[in-house]
Every structure is written in C-alpha cells, then in structure tokens.
Amino acid sequence: MKRKASLFFNTLVLFGVTLAGSSCSLLDNIMNQVGDAMGIRLSESKKTCVPGQKFKLKVFEEIIKGEVEEYTNYDANSWSSTNEEVATVDDRGNVVCHKVGSCDINFKSVGTKSCHVKVIEKELKSIKISRLKKKYAIGITQNELKGQIRNNSTITAVYTNNYEEAVIPQIINVSEVDTNTYGTYPVTFSYYITSNDLKESATGNIEITDASETSDKEKMERSIFDYADSSIRTTGYLINGKFKSVVIPIWFTDSDNFISEAKKDNIRNDAQKVFFSDNPSEDIGWESAKTYYEKESRVNGLLSGEKGLVDIDGKVSDWFIDTNPSSVYKDSEPESDLKQRAVDWYFSTTGENINDYDANNDGYLDGVIFMYGAPDYSTTGDSTNNLWYHVIAHSFSSRPSISTPILGNNMWVSYASMYGENNFKDRVGKNDYVKHYGKNTGLKLNPHTYIHETGHMFCLQDYYSTTRDESLPTENTMQSNNIGGHDPYSLLINNWANAYIPNESMTLDIRDVQSSHDIVLLTPKWNDAYSPFDEYIALELFAPNGLNEFDSNNGYGFGAYSEVGLRIWHIDSRLYCYDTGEITTDPRDGRTAILTDNSRGSPSGSQQIFKDHDEYPLLHLLRNDKDFSIDDTRLDMQESHYFKAGSTFSLEEFDKQFVEEGKLNNGLKLNWSVTVKNIYTNLDGSYGATLELIKSE
C-alpha cells in the first residue's frame, strides 16, 4: 500500500510545524479527517449484541469515487477495544462479546475508525426448529424417541436483537406420539434461559414408519459459494439461479488457415447449440451445457420433475476481429489485452447493459466464454501451449466493480472440439486437424469438453492427477475425463444434492444417483456446520441412465460403464483457515483453502503448510479389490471394481487404499461397515439398492 504510506508521510510533513506541541486530540482529529478523505470505513459503525455473540468487522477503502474494496493489509496491532471486559477483538477484526456494557472497537491506520458495541442482556424472543429428522422406526420407546430427536435436531434461539444461536432444549414433549402406530405426530420443543424465564416453544412433525425408511436427507448448510467467498484463490464464479452468458468467437488474422471464410456462421450457430440449445437431443444428440447443468442441478434427481437451481440464458456474439495472428497468444495468457478488448467491443456494439451479466452483484461478469478461431496446441504439434482449453480467473490487478463489472472466471476454448470425422470438413471447410477429434459417435456436435470447462466456472476442480500415472478418481466422471454426470462431492458442494447422514446402524434403500441424487455419507461424527468440506466416505448407486446414459452406450473417450453398482468414494475436502492457522470444515471461519487435491506429491497453497497432506487425495474412488493399493498406478478401473449385491466394505478390509491404512486421513477410525444386500429395478425404470449400514463403537 505505498500510496497510503506516501499520503500519510506527506500529511505529517504538511502539518509538522503546526502540530508541534499540539494536543493528541488535535492530531487524532486531523488524522481522522485524512482517513475520511482516503475513504476508509468499517463495515459497521454500531452493533447491539448479547453475551457470547461473535461478529467480524471489515475495513473498506474507496479506491475511486463510488468503488470500494476490502482492505486487509494492516498491522496486527491495528485493532483494539476500549473495554475488554465487555468485548475483545483479535488482529483480524473478529469481535467476541462477553458481558453487559458498552465499548468501542477501534481500527487505527491513518486516523481511527470505531464501531460502538452495546452488549445487552439475553432476552429470548422465540425459538425455531432448523433441522429435525422426520422418520423414526415403529416400536421405538418414547424415551428412545426423545433421545434420538435430541441427537437429530437443531433448535435455534432468537433474541431481541435478532441474534440467533443453536441451543439445547430443556423439554422435548412426545406425549402425543403413538410409537406403536404408523402416522405423523407433533413434537414440541421448549427452551428458556433461566428457570424464571417464560418458556418459548416450537412444534414440528415426525413420522412413525418402517425401520428401513427411517433416514432423511440432509441439506448442506455450506456450499462452494461460501468457499468462493472466503477463499484466497477463487472469485468471479457462477451461481445457482438465473444468469446470462455470452460466447465471443475470436477471428485472428490467420484464422482462415483453419476455417473457411464461408463457414464462419457455421461455427457461431454450432456454438449456440453446444452451449445453449433447449432442444439438444435434436441439435446435438446428447446435452448442451445449458441443459446439462439445468438437469444436474435438480436437487432430487432427474426423475423428480423439479426445476433445476441453474437457469442459463446465453447467446453467441458476432466474430470479434483481432488484429493479431493466433501465434501472438501462444505463450502467455491473453486476458490482459485481447479479452478486455473483446468485452469492450461486445458491450459497445450491442448496447446491452453490462450489469445484466452480473447476476449476484459481486462486480464480476458471469459466464463469459472466448472461443478462439484456431485449433488447440496438441493438434498443431507446435509450442502454442496457451491455445488450450481452460477456465482462468480474473487478473488480480483489477478491482471488481458493482457499477461496471469486470471479467471474473472466464472460459478460453477452441471451436474444434465441437466436431469429429463425421462433420469436421462440412462444418469448418478444412480438414487438416480432424484426426485429433475422433468420430463423435452418435453425436451431431460434441459438447463434452465445453460441459467440463463450464464445471470449472462453477468452481469445480479437475479431479485427475497431473503428477502421477495413477487414476484415483476414475475415468468416467465429468471433471475427471469429460464423461457422464458428476461425482457426489461436486453435487454436494453446489447444493445440487442432499445426503443421508446416518448416525446409527440401519438398513437403507437408495435409488440410483441420476434418478434421485441419493447420496449416503459415512463419518465418525458429522460436523456441526453441515459442511461438505470435511472428510467422509460417500456412497452412490451408479447406473447407465440420465446424464450417464449416452457415454455408457457410446464409449466416448474412456467411456462410462453399462452395469449398475455401488460406488464408494473417500473424500477429504477439509479446509485450512489462514486467519486462525487451523484446519476447519467451515468456510465461514475466515480465509480458507482446500487442503487436498488429486495431484498428489506436489504440494501447493495450504499443502505447503501441512506438507504431509500432499499425499492425501481430494477424491478417491475405491476399487472393490482388497489387494489394490492407493499407490497402484494401474488405470484399469473396471465394472468389476463396483460393489455389487453381496459385496461388503470397511476401512479395515480395504486398508491398502487409504494413506493412513485402516484410518481416515484425520487419524480417526470410520467405525462403519457396508453390505450391499440387493440391487434391483424400480417400476419407474430407476434402479435401487438395499444397504445394511452397521456402526460400531
């Protein structure tokens, strides 16, 4: 922050003679005025709290008129409290309220900015049920029922200042529940601060049902959107909801070496279909990027009939005519010049409102795709290694602006992967590079690469290894090898699926993941934040239907598989929090980064702090092969490695496939075993499996 230091120094020089012998209050007053002129402010100027409440103060500075950004480059001793018995603050602006009273939380840089904190007595306003397991087995005793309800519900107290916290209710009334009769019954929770307080109550309904149906799906309360907001590496992501996207095709001075001038409209029309078609079975032969993510974001699966969380509205622009050959961009990222010129051209020539392309108002443009008029470097065989398919973040030298959004995560792709031997010459006009792109069996246009890259724009990583020959994730997932649907982890972190999280032994029936998005998570103890950024075993029933169907039948690339079977994943997505220096599961704890990835043995980011974590994969699809090792470099993930009827699983049985041999990476035993009792076909055409889940002490 040299600009600030310079301004601070000049201010001292300017007032040096005048301030000699002056009071500190005068100096503070002048410094405060300087701070005001520099546009420094806190996120809150006053706050009413109750004892035990925590909140974070942020510092903002106005860069230019009307545009602000968070300021984090301050000294550890910048924060202070005028009364630490009332409230304390750490060196990152995290405030904890302790007792009734008032104080100021001060931030001192150029002048002092304050937040006045008033701590009042806890006055209970109401309670609410934020999580309640709905189904319980017939024949359970009322005492057992009360104990299970207490362990499987979250009660939140709401105070007069609207602060909320999870509490343990003193009373759970199940007197109206007939545990020996099927039906739905009310359960009342009551809570008070002290015995003299008026009790506040809330009522929820539970169902007495068969033992095999006693688990409810749980929604993840944390998502990739929380992580992206807190991450030191990720910004400008796509969101759930409706957003606009644009593809800008780029014509270089040498593009006519690769595309006939007369075929330019073919490229634009085909890109419109590959990315945004509403009728992809006719236009493509599979899915467009639009329909793929709109279907995959149906929380309860493709057969649910519900609307997906993702709603994409997109178009392809005219060609942006560049004044350079494609070779200019072969060795460096083109975004600093070419991309910005293309974006400026698009909005100036179309007259569209740039703010319409920032659906979440984060100051970054949503879904900008640059389709360059050249084949990728692996096809040409030269050193043009930037002419590849990737999604890259915005330039960190740029500052986001809500009034005029800038480029966020954006896609850089060639036109050529849309085609194969069956249509390359017809659509492009030239045939020089057709062999690289295969036959596109069963497809009119090929969307696979573009769907994969769109996954990156939703903050999904590549799940293949770039450092070893091993194939930990498996060949047939979208973020691993451009195949079929996504893995359970990708669904959970985007809130595109809910999960069964049992905490006791049970028999559970699940449907195949494409039809239902049924996922089972096994863990010694699930985290309080209900965050998917944890370590656990995930179960899903794979079937060759839904988004898996096309690749199962046509063998794109490695191909998907045509048989039904249980897939068992070891997922370790714990976070490192830079603000606390600790491992956490909650991205809201501060600035975080995921500890693991699938490029094992090559530590980066937070892995450099915990060097031993570079051996822990983020996603690992387990083989049904007790002799298979996590370090095995065989790439032959086969259908025989799926868990079929009669198969069993425990960490002790498959210890070779875990770095810590029989334990999770966190050092804990899983204490769960799984038996696949049966796999069957449902009347609606979906598939099902009966799982026996046994929890040991």
Describe these PLM feature segments.
Residues M1-L12:
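Bacterial N-terminal signal peptides that target proteins for export
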Residues S25-S212:
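Extracytoplasmic soluble-region selector
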Residues I64, E123, K242, F252-I259, ...:
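Primarily extracytoplasmic ectodomains and periplasmic/lumenal surface modules that are beta-strand-rich
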Residues N94, K242, L472-T474, P532-D534, ...:
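Short, solvent-exposed loop/turn segments at the edges of secondary structure
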Residues A211-Y450, Q461-R468, I571-E697:
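Propeptide-to-catalytic entry region of secreted or membrane-anchored zinc metalloproteases
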Residues G373-G557:
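Extracellular hydrolytic enzyme modules, especially secreted metalloproteases
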Residues N554-L566:
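Short coil-to-beta strand junction motifs in C2/discoidin
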